[in-house]
Amino acid sequence: RKLAFRYRRVKELYTTYKNNVGGLLGPAKRDAWLQLRAEVEALTDSWLTHALKSLSIISSRSNCVNVLVTTTQLIPALAKVLLYSLGAVFPIENIYSATKIGKESCFERIVSRFGTNIT
């Protein structure tokens, strides 16, 4: 019961801030985060901008969704998604952590949910 409440609260926070992580951080941390993001963009030849554009195109299609499978634990993975401003293209229901159950189980759940005719 306590765990279910925790995950409901996490989902609520994720949904609230998926398009505005700066609102979660506060002004001082927001400015530092924006500066860090700008530095990462400069050092990676705008990798994040290009990735976000590609993922946005996919999520805008009516018959497509983005799914994320990670070996990071779920809560830190959600935090990373928000910090990279990817919350808008990855609904929380489509983020799977393989930490405890393994990648195979994650992909079985995805196939069970979306079917076998996926790319």
Swiss-Prot record:
**Superkingdom of this protein's organism:** Eukaryota
Database matches in InterPro entries: EYA, EYA_dom_sf
Q: Where in the cell is it found?
A: Cytoplasm; Nucleus
What GO terms are given for molecular function? Answer: protein tyrosine phosphatase activity
- Kindly list the cofactors needed: Mg(2+)
Record's GO cellular component, any one?
nucleus
Which free-text remark accompanies the cofactor? Binds 1 Mg(2+) ion per subunit.
Q: What is its main location?
A: cytoplasm
The EC number of this protein is 3.1.3.48
Q: Which GO terms describe its biological process?
A: cell differentiation; chromatin organization; DNA repair; negative regulation of extrinsic apoptotic signaling pathway in absence of ligand; positive regulation of DNA repair
Give the UniProt keywords, A-Z.
Activator, Chromatin regulator, Cytoplasm, Developmental protein, DNA damage, DNA repair, Hydrolase, Magnesium, Nucleus, Protein phosphatase, Transcription, Transcription regulation
Q: Which reaction does it catalyse?
A: O-phospho-L-tyrosyl-[protein] + H2O = L-tyrosyl-[protein] + phosphate
Specify the enzyme's EC class, one word: hydrolase
- Family recorded in the similarity comment: Belongs to the HAD-like hydrolase superfamily. EYA family.
**What does this protein's UniProt record list under function?**
Tyrosine phosphatase that specifically dephosphorylates 'Tyr-142' of histone H2AX (H2AXY142ph). 'Tyr-142' phosphorylation of histone H2AX plays a central role in DNA repair and acts as a mark that distinguishes between apoptotic and repair responses to genotoxic stress. Promotes efficient DNA repair by dephosphorylating H2AX, promoting the recruitment of DNA repair complexes containing MDC1. Its function as histone phosphatase probably explains its role in transcription regulation during organogenesis. May be involved in development of the eye.
Report what the protein is called: Protein phosphatase EYA4
User: Which organism is this protein's natural source?
Assistant: Takifugu rubripes (Japanese pufferfish)
